[in-house]
């Protein structure tokens, strides 16, 4: 196993104006980024970064800073597969030459981090790429963008970093992997940490959710405890339906059956046949009830994969005209999937969950939760109920979004798919 350094050392180095290396999850980019605080940028630091990285230097910024500086999205429809929020590129208006030199880019970085700077201090386009970090940092999105802003803030500096991916010195044309990054860190006296470690540190020292209420909820699947949460970063309320003891005198929080369910008014409440959400929620509650122990976490604010109810209805109009569920979102200028699971992960941790069997057909959901210190020991598939109204939608989820759905090609209205449930499940 690769030797890692402490988050405390990385924070101290950032505060001292040094660079650090941060590695993300192997199921995500699986890359190491060189990171330093933007306000500490010097020509020497920038030249070092350019020499050992791809050279595509970015400056992650807090959302409020982006708003103050008028940094609009680079493209209206973000199609980046990891959701990196690129904004329009910039150069400092004054004190630079062409903008590309290490000295010029250091000047632009420091200006981006300066709380006194305004939008008019920059020219657009330029040679530095600002990125908009998610509010809540790595607890909301486990990316290098958020890690850079978190590290700067934890060091007592302005919420602005500088990042770029380290390239391999052994395999030209590839990005450096973990073992090579450790050697590189030792050669240059740099701290090497992971985003997972940063998440764990923040989880131990900070809390971004609040448990507000708890009540008994009798359902047709038996009785659950409904535990309500709020988040300081979202004006949204979430509910966890809990069955049995998750963690306590007789339970250690391991091997918990968990469903993280995205809100779907049309499917969950109205019984729409355009999606499989309602039947999946019902099946999850039934499976947890039958297990006698588990959690069904109902995530509000995830309507339409995060685009909202009215946008979802607009997307339905486009689907009726021939677009699939992905293209409909993109035509509306919206991402195919805007959900994040950071708050859900914190709720599960608060409930005492340590390891889980995750009820989902969506492998991306596993990645979205796994980066938060929750150990997913198994992905448990949910049964699928296909019909003439949702078969194309299900095929799109399988073919374009990577969902693990089998039997769809053999579907016709009179035949049930493998694992389809009835009222007895």
Curated annotation (Swiss-Prot):
<dbReference type="GO" id="GO:0003935">
    <property type="term" value="F:GTP cyclohydrolase II activity"/>
</dbReference>
<dbReference type="InterPro" id="IPR000422">
    <property type="entry name" value="DHBP_synthase_RibB"/>
</dbReference>
<feature type="binding site">
    <location>
        <position position="33"/>
    </location>
    <ligand>
        <name>D-ribulose 5-phosphate</name>
    </ligand>
</feature>
<keyword id="KW-0342">GTP-binding</keyword>
<dbReference type="GO" id="GO:0009231">
    <property type="term" value="P:riboflavin biosynthetic process"/>
</dbReference>
<feature type="binding site">
    <location>
        <position position="280"/>
    </location>
    <ligand>
        <name>GTP</name>
    </ligand>
</feature>
<keyword id="KW-0456">Lyase</keyword>
<feature type="binding site">
    <location>
        <begin position="28"/>
        <end position="29"/>
    </location>
    <ligand>
        <name>D-ribulose 5-phosphate</name>
    </ligand>
</feature>
<feature type="binding site">
    <location>
        <position position="275"/>
    </location>
    <ligand>
        <name>Zn(2+)</name>
    </ligand>
</feature>
<feature type="active site" description="Proton acceptor; for GTP cyclohydrolase activity">
    <location>
        <position position="337"/>
    </location>
</feature>
<feature type="binding site">
    <location>
        <position position="29"/>
    </location>
    <ligand>
        <name>Mg(2+) 1</name>
    </ligand>
</feature>
<comment type="pathway">
    <text>Cofactor biosynthesis; riboflavin biosynthesis; 2-hydroxy-3-oxobutyl phosphate from D-ribulose 5-phosphate: step 1/1.</text>
</comment>
<comment type="function">
    <text>Catalyzes the conversion of GTP to 2,5-diamino-6-ribosylamino-4(3H)-pyrimidinone 5'-phosphate (DARP), formate and pyrophosphate.</text>
</comment>
<feature type="binding site">
    <location>
        <position position="360"/>
    </location>
    <ligand>
        <name>GTP</name>
    </ligand>
</feature>
<dbReference type="InterPro" id="IPR016299">
    <property type="entry name" value="Riboflavin_synth_RibBA"/>
</dbReference>
<comment type="function">
    <text>Catalyzes the conversion of D-ribulose 5-phosphate to formate and 3,4-dihydroxy-2-butanone 4-phosphate.</text>
</comment>
<feature type="binding site">
    <location>
        <begin position="141"/>
        <end position="145"/>
    </location>
    <ligand>
        <name>D-ribulose 5-phosphate</name>
    </ligand>
</feature>
<feature type="binding site">
    <location>
        <position position="144"/>
    </location>
    <ligand>
        <name>Mg(2+) 2</name>
    </ligand>
</feature>
<keyword id="KW-0547">Nucleotide-binding</keyword>
<feature type="binding site">
    <location>
        <begin position="303"/>
        <end position="305"/>
    </location>
    <ligand>
        <name>GTP</name>
    </ligand>
</feature>
<keyword id="KW-0862">Zinc</keyword>
<dbReference type="GO" id="GO:0005829">
    <property type="term" value="C:cytosol"/>
</dbReference>
<feature type="active site" description="Nucleophile; for GTP cyclohydrolase activity">
    <location>
        <position position="339"/>
    </location>
</feature>
<keyword id="KW-0686">Riboflavin biosynthesis</keyword>
<keyword id="KW-0378">Hydrolase</keyword>
<dbReference type="GO" id="GO:0005525">
    <property type="term" value="F:GTP binding"/>
</dbReference>
<feature type="binding site">
    <location>
        <position position="29"/>
    </location>
    <ligand>
        <name>Mg(2+) 2</name>
    </ligand>
</feature>
<feature type="binding site">
    <location>
        <position position="365"/>
    </location>
    <ligand>
        <name>GTP</name>
    </ligand>
</feature>
<comment type="pathway">
    <text>Cofactor biosynthesis; riboflavin biosynthesis; 5-amino-6-(D-ribitylamino)uracil from GTP: step 1/4.</text>
</comment>
<dbReference type="Pfam" id="PF00925">
    <property type="entry name" value="GTP_cyclohydro2"/>
</dbReference>
<feature type="site" description="Essential for DHBP synthase activity">
    <location>
        <position position="165"/>
    </location>
</feature>
<feature type="binding site">
    <location>
        <position position="165"/>
    </location>
    <ligand>
        <name>D-ribulose 5-phosphate</name>
    </ligand>
</feature>
<protein>
    <recommendedName>
        <fullName>Riboflavin biosynthesis protein RibBA</fullName>
        <ecNumber>4.1.99.12</ecNumber>
        <ecNumber>3.5.4.25</ecNumber>
    </recommendedName>
</protein>
<comment type="similarity">
    <text>In the C-terminal section; belongs to the GTP cyclohydrolase II family.</text>
</comment>
<keyword id="KW-0479">Metal-binding</keyword>
<dbReference type="GO" id="GO:0008686">
    <property type="term" value="F:3,4-dihydroxy-2-butanone-4-phosphate synthase activity"/>
</dbReference>
<keyword id="KW-0464">Manganese</keyword>
<dbReference type="InterPro" id="IPR017945">
    <property type="entry name" value="DHBP_synth_RibB-like_a/b_dom"/>
</dbReference>
<keyword id="KW-0511">Multifunctional enzyme</keyword>
<comment type="similarity">
    <text>In the N-terminal section; belongs to the DHBP synthase family.</text>
</comment>
<dbReference type="GO" id="GO:0000287">
    <property type="term" value="F:magnesium ion binding"/>
</dbReference>
<feature type="binding site">
    <location>
        <position position="277"/>
    </location>
    <ligand>
        <name>Zn(2+)</name>
    </ligand>
</feature>
């Amino acid at each position: 196993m690769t030797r890692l350094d402490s988050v405390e050392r990385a924070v101290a180095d950032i505060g001292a104006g040094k660079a650090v290396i941060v590695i993300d999850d192997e199921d995500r980019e699986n890359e190491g980024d060189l990171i330093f605080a933007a306000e500490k940028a010097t020509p020497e630091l920038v030249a070092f970064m350019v020499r050992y990285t791809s050279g595509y230097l970015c400056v992650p910024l807090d959302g409020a800073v982006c708003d103050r500086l008028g940094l609009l999205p680079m493209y209206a429809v973000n199609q980046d597969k990891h959701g990196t929020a690129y904004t329009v590129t910039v150069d400092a208006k004054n004190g630079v030459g062409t903008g590309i030199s290490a000295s010029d880019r250091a000047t632009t970085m420091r200006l981006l981090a300066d709380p006194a700077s305004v939008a008019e201090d920059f020219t657009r386009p330029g040679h530095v790429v600002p990125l908009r970090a998610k509010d809540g940092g790595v607890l909301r999105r486990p990316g290098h963008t958020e890690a850079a802003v978190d590290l700067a803030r934890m060091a007592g500096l302005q919420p602005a970093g500088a990042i770029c991916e380290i390239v391999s010195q052994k395999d030209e044309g590839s990005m450096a992997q973990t073992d090579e990054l450790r050697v590189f860190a030792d050669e240059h006296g740099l701290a090497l940490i992971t985003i997972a470690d940063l998440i764990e540190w923040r989880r131990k020292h900070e809390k971004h959710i609040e448990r507000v209420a708890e009540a008994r909820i009798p359902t047709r699947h038996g009785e659950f405890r409904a535990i309500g949460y709020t988040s300081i970063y979202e004006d949204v309320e979430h509910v966890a339906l809990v069955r049995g003891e998750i963690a306590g005198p007789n339970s250690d929080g391991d091997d918990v059956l968990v469903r993280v369910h995205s809100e779907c008014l049309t499917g969950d409440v109205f019984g729409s046949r355009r999606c499989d959400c309602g039947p999946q929620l019902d099946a999850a509650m039934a499976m947890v009830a039958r297990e006698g122990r588990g959690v069904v976490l109902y995530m509000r604010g995830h309507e339409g994969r995060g685009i909202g109810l009215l946008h979802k209805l607009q997307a339905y109009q486009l689907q009726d005209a021939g677009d699939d569920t992905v293209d409909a979102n993109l035509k509306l200028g919206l991402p195919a999937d805007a959900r994040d699971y950071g708050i859900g992960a914190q709720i599960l941790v608060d409930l005492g969950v340590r390891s889980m069997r995750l009820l989902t057909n969506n492998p991306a959901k596993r990645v979205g939760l796994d980066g938060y210190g929750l150990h997913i020991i198994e992905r448990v598939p949910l049964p699928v109920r296909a019909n003439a109204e949702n078969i194309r939608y299900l095929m799109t989820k399988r073919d374009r979004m990577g969902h693990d759905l089998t039997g769809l090609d053999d579907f016709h209205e009179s035949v049930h798919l493998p694992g389809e449930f009835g009222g007895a499940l």
